[in-house]
Amino acid sequence: MTFRNCVAVDLGASSGRVMLARYERECRSLTLREIYRFNNGLHSQNGYVTWDVDSLESAIRLGLNKVCEEGIRIDSIGIDTWGVDFVLLDLQGKRVGLPVAYRDSRTNGLMTQAQQQLGKRDIYQRSGIQFLPFNTLYQLRALTEQQPELIPHIAHALLMPDYFSYRLTGKMNWEYTNATTTQLVNINSDDWDESLLAWSGANKAWFGRPTHPGNVIGHWICPQGNEIPVVAVASHDTASAVIASPLNGSRAAYLSSGTWSLMGFESQTPFTNDTALAANITNEGGAEGRYRVLKNIMGLWLLQRVLQERQINDLPALIAATQALPACRFTINPNDDRFINPDEMCSEIQAACRETAQPIPESDAELARCIVDSLALLYADVLHELAQLRGEDFSQLHIVGGGCQNALLNQLCADACGIRVIAGPVEASTLGNIGIQLMTLDELNNVDDFRQVVSTTANLTTFTPNPDSEIAHYVAQIHSTRQTKELCA
């Protein structure tokens, strides 16, 4: 038997993990084992919301060392993280300034300023990326405007996964899928857009040309002295998750469900027309030159904050209590900027309901019900927008990532969207990370080949839409009202 041992470092906004994958060539089987899991979260430092990158690096090294201590020969390592955030370095490779997190308020008002000065359509035609107030474009503008004293010291700007790869290897890389999330990469050239960089105040010399997934960045020397290749995987965690989504045919959509929910479809070409711009659709880079045509949705961040504020530890009990409540008594727009990082999420949700003359969710279960109903309704709206954009309905929706373990939300999504939902795999980002490593090691031919492996090894659960559910009737009523308004317009 021929085995490959690949290690995926998968960092999310709330946790990180070091996972060992064992691939058996002859039977094309893939097994995952968690080596080390650790917390991640936002910190307050000198008036900014930041990441503790030193703690994250220590946790990564600890996890890798644990694998080596077991006597396992590692064939390769890959790192994926969330998008848009970066670390600045000087000529000696030392950090400049703080690793500020995207939920910091320093970018307030800058997206509007960019649209006024550069033109919203021009920015979109150049980047093809969704307008989000925390995109790297606006973060760099905030930095160069608010902390100009740092500029003379900056030699390099590395996105988060590239920074951690650099810390392991001493080699710098700018991986393409994550680079596209910045709103600074030109969609036609796949290189940094000079006009957008100029507006941000950043120097193009801070960046190297983006590289597509599948190259070896450098090597990490383990405690035993072995040199282990560090592969540039699809380093944006959603790009990795999509690789591991067992999409079956062109009519399949995906939803990467976690702190963020990202819903979209794969395409060989980007969508940058006026319809896409009006819907605020993003065209992020994917593996093998594909585009991830998708839309960002605030996701389970809202529920995570409620759990934290109410000190709820028994999530299954909360979900059971939530399921017993009637649907759609309280609904909000999860994508409202007010929910990005409020002081108190529970109070913010209640205020939003109060302002729209709805009942106020008071109990833990009522707050959770408000969130899951609102997410399912937004999923239905976004799926409809995506279908209109491409001119064809979807036949099924694949929900992947940690959020796919929420059976209530999966069923609500199926009912609201009126579409079959297939949930799994849970560890989609990790698996997609491993998939690129196996392709780099010449064990697999391409993404479609890897998806066949995932389909046969992952635990998948199907949710069939119930047209008689409360939320399905609610959606039908909304659509009927919209059509009436359109006829009367």
From Swiss-Prot:
Pathway: Carbohydrate degradation; L-rhamnose degradation; glycerone phosphate from L-rhamnose: step 2/3. The lineage of its organism: Bacteria, Pseudomonadati, Pseudomonadota, Gammaproteobacteria, Enterobacterales. Substrate binds at residues 83, 236-238, 296. Involved in the catabolism of L-rhamnose (6-deoxy-L-mannose). Catalyzes the transfer of the gamma-phosphate group from ATP to the 1-hydroxyl group of L-rhamnulose to yield L-rhamnulose 1-phosphate. ATP binds at residues 13-17, 259, 304, 402. The keyword Nucleotide-binding applies. Disulfide bonds join 68-222, 353-370, 413-417. It comes from Escherichia coli (strain SMS-3-5 / SECEC). This is Rhamnulokinase. One of its GO terms (biological process) is glycerol metabolic process. It catalyses: L-rhamnulose + ATP = L-rhamnulose 1-phosphate + ADP + H(+). The keyword Magnesium applies. GO terms for molecular function: ATP binding; glycerol kinase activity; rhamnulokinase activity. One of its GO terms (cellular component) is cytosol. It comes from the Bacteria. It holds the Pfam family FGGY_N. The active site is at 237 (proton acceptor). HAMAP family: Rhamnulokinase (MF_01535). NCBIfam families: PRK10640.1, rhamnulo_kin.
